[in-house]
Amino acid sequence: MTPIKRIYVFSVLIILFSSTLGSPAVAQVLTKKVDPLRPIIEIKTQKTLTVEELIEKLKRANYTLLGEFHDNASHHQLRGDLILRLNQSKQTVVVEYLLAGKEVQFSGSTLESLHTAGFNSKAWPWSIYGPLFETLRISQRPIVGSNLDRSISKAIFSGANNPIPSSLKVDYQKSSLSAPAMAALEQDLIEGHCGKLPPAYLKPMMLVQRLTDISMARVLLERSSGILLAGNGHIRKDYGVPQVLKAIAPHQFVVNVAFTEDDGLDSKAIANYRDRYDYVWLTKPIERKDPCADLQFGKPSS
């Protein structure tokens, strides 16, 4: 199972269907979680970074985009702890796991507060995401949603006329993908759905993916700075949120960090990441059931 498959099987299908800040203790915990055999790599220079070096680089950005494999709990733990360390401001945390327009107001338990904001703990299992949100609550940062409204996705898949809402149409036109980026997105969606994606699904799925990235970018730009938590596919520079931000807000300083699974990257593998990510944080691969084994598609709506 390739990394890109885990990006999309656990992301697009979910979208469519379903005060210890900066303390030495926090720093020590985060440092201990970094496996020296699976480092943080700066893609441009191919240098290995310490956590402290990465933090200093992220502090310079207007917008920091942190990726993930959705089912890897260590990615969520590392990102939560990283946000605790980025304590120079109270940047808003923008998340994929809530719809755009939703904001978490903590009252009572963390899970109850998230449910009130529309969080789906079946789509985003609490056993995996719970520690992340508990850490975000400690950080005292605002948490807002950015995902595409499901009614838009349903309209696209039902074949509705003019399904792109007026609020996103201008940015959709401004951020049109180049032919190579469009081809890369198409291929990744096909591979990411195990080669089982019916041809009739491809065009609407690509549109949903693009509008989701635009929705995320718009929510970020409502603030002077922010941190996005989303799947690695959404934070890609060639066809994800950074591409949208570059098209509609070219003067903003955007940095992305992919959290991925690998025992190591050679120079060729690093070169393949050059047009996608600024930094890659490697973690130990986890054991998982093959998501392709039971993946099936019904007939698209006509």
Identify the meaning behind each predicted range.
Residues 36-40, 59-67, 110-117:
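Acidic/histidine-rich, surface-exposed loop or edge segments in extracytoplasmic proteins
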Residues 97, 104-223:
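A substrate-binding/cap region within the structured catalytic cores of diverse enzymes
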Residues 92-98, 255-260:
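Short internal beta-strands
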Residues 70-81, 94, 100-109:
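Membrane-embedded segments
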Residues 215-224, 234-302:
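C-terminal regions of proteins
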Residues 46-87:
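Zymogen propeptides
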Residues 13-61:
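N- or domain-start disorder-to-order transition segments that initiate the globular core
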Residues 2-11:
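Bacterial N-terminal signal peptides that target proteins for export
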